[in-house]
Regions:
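Domain-scale terminal segments
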Residues: 4-185, 212
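A composition-driven signal for long, intrinsically disordered, charge-rich low-complexity tracts
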Residues: 51, 144-147, 188-190, 217-230
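A short, highly charged nucleic-acid-interacting micro-segment common to nuclease
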Residues: 184-197
Length: 269
């Protein structure tokens, strides 16, 4: 995959100064976890397992956490959406003031972030192994931070993260090959499944908001032969959607009318 135009993700430590006299750690943790949730739904941080701990910085007591961010400046206030700011204001009422953050290190295990946040086209794509935005550039396949396009649509951004969680859960089940394998596979590979319908709706809403053609990735596995796979038509309109050459070793099919992309069955790749 060509990731020449991308930048690494970062391990970052935000710090909240504690100015309250009484120390209700349970309540303070809940308020900070609410900020973590909203940062995540806005795409400012990646992943769900966030350590939160008491610490001291420059002689001041407070809380810190370790988060993965797609960019060095992801946590700057200008990237906040309305719901992040509300969670911050709520925490401030209880004496928790966001003081800033320090960059600890580059995260060498993370997926890289797109440098161009407004490509010629983009797609909704994820896998059970990915820890990044589900919005991928059609220019170089790298993930685009959600706040770059959806900061003014918090509900849409959150809905997209929920869709990603569901897609990854189904992918994990079908890859494990045990409980609910068949049902999970049909959710990510059938055009009329609940998950695919949700994803197509989200892609259309994102295109409306961003003005960028936004496609939905339909997973493909099985099939009879490589030859029959290559002759596959668009499952929505029945049209020819085969690309002259595959993109990023993944995308072999692209229907501009239906805003769909797909792979040749993984059985033959």
């Amino acid at each position: 995959r060509n990731l020449a135009q991308s930048v690494i993700m970062y391990l970052i430590e935000p710090f909240f100064k504690l100015t309250a006299l009484e120390n209700d750690i349970g309540q303070q943790s809940r308020l900070l976890n609410a900020i973590i949730d909203q940062w995540r739904y806005n795409g400012q941080i990646i992943g769900r397992e966030i350590p939160l701990y008491l610490t001291e910085e420059d002689g001041e007591q407070g809380f810190a956490m370790r988060v993965i961010c797609p960019e060095q400046d992801s946590l700057l206030p200008e990237n906040n959406n309305q719901t992040v700011n509300l969670a911050m204001e709520h925490a401030e009422k209880y004496g928790l003031n966001f003081q800033g953050f320090q960059i600890i290190a580059d995260d060498l295990n993370a997926d890289s972030t797109a440098e161009c946040s407004h490509p010629a086209w983009q797609m909704l794509y994820t896998t059970h192994l990915q820890s990044c935005s589900p919005l991928h550039s059609g220019d170089d396949f790298s993930p685009i931070p959600l706040y770059k396009q959806l900061k003014n649509q918090p509900h849409l951004s959150q809905d997209l993260i929920k869709w990603q969680e569901n897609w990854q859960a189904c992918d994990q089940l079908q890859m494990n090959g045990s409980a609910l394998e068949k049902e999970a596979l049909s959710e990510i590979s059938e055009i009329n499944s609940t998950l695919s319908k949700h994803g197509l709706y989200l892609a259309a809403e994102i295109e409306k908001e961003s003005g960028i053609p936004t496609y939905y990735y339909l997973y493909r596995v099985g099939g009879h032969s490589l030859e029959s796979e290559q002759q596959r038509c668009c499952p929505q309109c029945g049209g020819d959607w085969t690309l002259d050459a595959p993109l990023f070793d993944v995308i072999y099919f692209k229907c501009d009318q239906c805003r769909l992309v797909s792979n040749v069955s993984w059985n033959f790749l």
